[in-house]
Regions:
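A short alpha-helical cap/connector motif
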Residues: 1-194, 198-222, 227-274
Length: 274
């Protein structure tokens, strides 16, 4: 029934009006009920720090205390632009709000890999209704002094807007990653790096290997949508390689509870030492 109503509205409304109606319905069905319920329901992520037994103090404590059931302003902003970071299947925005909430007025440099291609022929696409650049526009709105950069393998969706610039990158190609980081705009390093590209272990580690050195002191590197069946592989990689290779960084693997998604609603969050 809901699908039929959506299709009828899509046919009769302009794209912008249809987007506004969908956002209003989302607020009524998801945001407001969850906002009320979050006063009574507390759901926190399972957080594993690396190396095993390492206590990273306030960083891990902060992550373990986030109520991922509670919607936030970031949830609304990202959803308004068409991002899936906080609209049901993923609920990362509560965690990001806790991590970045005090940085609202800072002149941040942010890079997100994966613009959200709607090219159905490419792996990890967002479907025909996907909105490329949705998350980038969300970051721009949330941080009014930030410069936001994006990268994607789909050259057809690259774009440039006010405080947003995007580049080509194939995250399985080490040369392409080096070429990305050779761009003049990216020479100062990043305060926040998000990998929301090709969601495979090999792709994630490939981009991480070529990008972590470009994270500024105190910066945060995030890998989204880690699949549940790769958690143990990540445990081993973090314990035996990355935590030793980067001893001044804090590593936290988060399994984020979500009744709508029990397969890939997991994050790796890395904080660079000062």
């Amino acid at each position: 029934m809901i699908a039929k109503v959506r299709e009828l509205l899509r046919q009769r409304l302009s794209p912008l009006a249809f987007q506004d109606v969908c956002f209003y319905l989302w607020n009524c069905r998801f945001y407001l009920p969850r906002l009320i319920a979050s006063a009574f329901v507390q759901r926190t992520p399972i957080v594993q720090g690396f190396p095993h037994g390492h206590i990273a103090g306030p960083f891990l404590h902060q992550l373990r205390g986030v109520n991922v059931f509670a919607p936030t302003k970031m949830c609304r902003v990202m959803t308004r632009h068409g991002s899936d970071k906080g609209r049901g299947i993923h609920n990362y925005t509560a965690i990001y709000s806790a991590l970045f909430g005090t940085l609202h007025d800072q002149p941040l440099l942010i890079l997100e890999l994966g613009l959200g291609t709607n090219n159905m022929n490419l792996t990890s696409n967002m479907g025909a209704e996907g909105k490329p650049g949705a998350s980038l526009r969300g970051w721009r709105d949330l941080f009014p002094r930030a410069l936001v950069y994006g990268a994607d393998i789909d050259r057809g969706i690259l774009f440039e807007e006010d405080r947003i610039k995007t580049f080509y990158c194939d995250q399985l190609d080490s040369l392409a990653i080096r070429n990305l980081w050779s761009q003049p705009d990216l020479q100062s390093g990043m305060d926040i790096i998000i990998d929301d590209g090709l969601h495979t272990f090999d792709a994630n580690t490939s981009f991480l290997d070529g990008s972590l050195e470009h994270l500024r002191p105190g910066g945060v590197y995030i890998i989204e949508d880690i699949h549940q069946n790769t958690i143990e592989r990540w445990h081993n990689q973090l314990e035996t390689i990355y935590s030793k290779q980067f001893p001044n960084h804090d590593f936290a693997l988060l399994e984020v509870p979500n009744s709508s998604n029990q397969s890939d609603n997991n994050l790796l969050i890395i904080r660079s030492g000062a």
